[in-house]
Amino acid sequence: MSEAGDRAEIGAVIDEMYAMISGPAGPRDWSRQANCFHPEARQIRTWIDEGGNPACRIMGLEDYARDTGPFFAENDFFEIEIGRRIDLFGNIAHVWSAYEARASLEDAEPERRGINSIQLFKDPGKGWRIMAMIWDNEREGLALPDFD
C-alpha cells in the first residue's frame, strides 16, 4: 500500500474510534473496538491529582469499556477531533489527535479539550490497529498547540 493509502486507512481508524465513543446517552457498541484497536491495546487516562501530581490509569479494552460504560449510559457525550498529525514509519505510526468533548453538538463551548497520543501497528491480517492511546486535557498553563 502507498503512503497515501496508509494515511487514509489510519485516518479511518481514528475516525471510527471517535465515532465509537460518541453519541447520545445509552450503551456503546463495544464490539466496534475490534475495528480500531489491537486486542492487547492499552488506553491510558491521565490527570492531575488532588496533590497537584500527575496520575494515570492504564486500561485494557475490557477495563475501558467497564469504566466508561456507566458514564456513557447516563450522559450524552461527543468527542470531536479538531486537529490531527500523522507520523508514519514502515509498519508503525503515531497520531497526535486534538479533540473537544461536548455533551451536545450544539454547545457553544466544549466541556474540555485535549490531545490523544495514539500509536498504531500495521497488522498483516487486520490492517492498522491502535496499540496504545494516552490522553491529557487542557488546563491552566497547558493549552493545545496549533495543528498547521
Where are these regions (language model features)?
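A short local loop/turn or secondary-structure capping micro-motif enriched for an aromatic residue
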Residues: G51-N53, A103-L105, N137-L142
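Non-catalytic cap/lid and distal C-terminal segments of serine-dependent acyl enzymes
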Residues: Y64-R66, R112, P145
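Short beta-strand edge/turn micro-motifs at domain boundaries
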Residues: H94, R113-L144
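Early exported N-terminus immediately downstream of N-terminal targeting peptides
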Residues: F37-T46, E50
